[in-house]
From Swiss-Prot:
The keyword Membrane applies. Involved in sterol-regulated ubiquitination and degradation of HMG-CoA reductase HMGCR. Involved in positive regulation of AMPA-selective glutamate receptor GRIA2 recycling to the cell surface. Acts as a negative regulator of hepatocyte growth during regeneration. Interacts with EEF1A1, CAMLG, GRIA2 and GRIP1. Interacts with NPM1 and CDKN2A; TMUB1 can enhance interaction between NPM1 and CDKN2A and is proposed to bridge the proteins; proposed to be mediated by iHOPS. Interacts with TUBG1. Interacts with ERLIN2 and AMFR; TMUB1 promotes the interaction of ERLIN2 with AMFR. Residues 102-175 form the Ubiquitin-like domain. Residues 2-30 are annotated as: Required to release iHOPS from membranes. It is a multi-pass membrane protein. GO terms for biological process: ERAD pathway. The chain crosses the membrane at residues 11-31, 194-214, 219-239. The lineage of its organism: Eukaryota, Metazoa, Chordata, Craniata, Vertebrata. It comes from the Eukaryota. This is Transmembrane and ubiquitin-like domain-containing protein 1. GO terms for cellular component: centrosome; nucleolus; postsynaptic membrane; recycling endosome. Induction: Up-regulated in regenerating liver.
Length: 245
């Protein structure tokens, strides 16, 4: 007995396989679509300097004096004050006292310790690069229960005492850093989310196959039943991995 009246089983199976391939192709294409981003706004032009609000009005009020006249202020003007000679003694500021290096004890999760020597002006990022070259993004420093996440913060601003303990946590994996979103720009609208519909479609197809296997058991040999069971197990693991918190 054919699955569909008037249509051979080979044609039905062929169309089912083509439908599955089409769904997989659409899901693969949807994962490679790039999100369009809005262009960054151009920086506003520089404002022109403001023109002076008041003109020099004092020059208009000066009166011209006669050529032979002599100002009374010139008669009574005394000799100009002579500048005092420079004694040559300048107050010299005492030089800054040299800062002492900090001895830090880096303690790991396995209770092993490593002594690091740094300066107060060194930053958290430079300390990571010095002690853990190539693993800066995987190292987390913790001091008194507080995560030191700002790599630009200096050690002197933390007021670390001598021979203090910094707990180090080195993660095994780290994702690529996400660039910060520029101001004034918003993420563009996402494309067609076909990838999120793939799992429900596969579940619907799986339920249809199990229904056909139960209703038309003679058309499903042992190998087809085992393949259907394996596909069900694989799809269950995929769903668990996707929706696991």
């Amino acid at each position: 007995m054919a699955l569909i009246e008037g249509v051979g089983d080979e044609v039905t199976v062929l169309f089912a396989v083509l439908a599955c391939l089409l769904v997989l192709a659409l899901a693969w294409v949807s994962t490679h679509t790039t999100e369009s981003t809005d262009p960054q706004p151009q920086p506003p032009g520089t404002t022109t300097p403001a023109q002076p609000s008041e003109a020099m009005s004092a020059s208009d009020s000066i009166r011209e004096e006669a050529p032979g006249a002599e100002s009374p202020s010139l008669r009574h003007r005394g000799p100009s004050a002579q500048p005092e000679p420079d004694t040559g003694v300048t107050a010299s500021t005492p030089p800054d006292s040299p800062q002492e290096p900090l001895l830090l004890r880096l303690k790991f999760l396995n209770d092993s310790e490593q002594v690091a020597r740094a300066w107060p002006q060194d930053t958290i990022g430079s300390l990571k690069r010095t002690q853990f070259p190539g693993q800066e993004q995987q190292v987390r420093l913790i001091y008194q229960g507080q995560l030191l996440g700002d790599d630009t913060q200096t050690l002197g601003s933390l007021h670390l005492p001598p021979n203090c303990v910094l707990h180090c946590h080195v993660s095994t994996r780290v994702g690529p850093p996400h660039p910060p979103c520029p101001p004034g720009s918003e993420p563009g609208p996402s494309g067609l989310e076909i990838g999120s519909l793939l799992l429900p479609l596969l579940l619907l197809l799986l339920l249809l196959l199990w229904y056909c296997q139960i209703q038309y058991r003679p058309f499903f040999p042992l190998t087809a039943t085992l393949g259907l069971a394996g596909f069900t197990l694989l799809l269950s693991l995929l769903a668990f991995a996707m929706y696991r918190p």
